[in-house]
Amino acid sequence: MPWRAERRQMYDRVVDVPRLVSFHDLTVDEPPHPAVARLRRRLNDIYAGELGEPFTTVGLCCYRDGSDSVAWHGDTIGRSSSEDTMVAIVSLGATRTFALRPRGGGRSLRLPQAHGDLLVMGGSCQRTWEHAVPKTSAPTGPRVSMQFRPRDVR
């Protein structure tokens, strides 16, 4: 897998992103692994009718251990800021918590995501909820998250 370490602007400084990433536009790029192509086909078979379009991109995150994480956020770049969209997330490897909370505050949901689990966020979820993969102090192995999205949704 062609993993990259990234740095991002966070308020007044640039920080290391606490996970490795790899992004692929599957309308242009070859899938990074044959399993990605198979999963995309299967997810499109199941969800493209409801979504009204196919999944065209895959973003991969590698959480190397419990110190790797993603902060609370909503996927609001592109169309998901104003339209109902769908993201299908497949987890591989160690179990990690996927947390959801209503945007603007409220009680959060904590969903353990184990090897092979599929989590689908659809409808207005990206606009009305935030999600995170919090750090954990419990010993944990690596986890890979594959996020399949339609065009112009990040």
Stretch-by-stretch model annotation:
Residues 1-154:
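Non-heme Fe(II) oxygenase metal-center motifs and adjacent flexible, charged/small-residue loops
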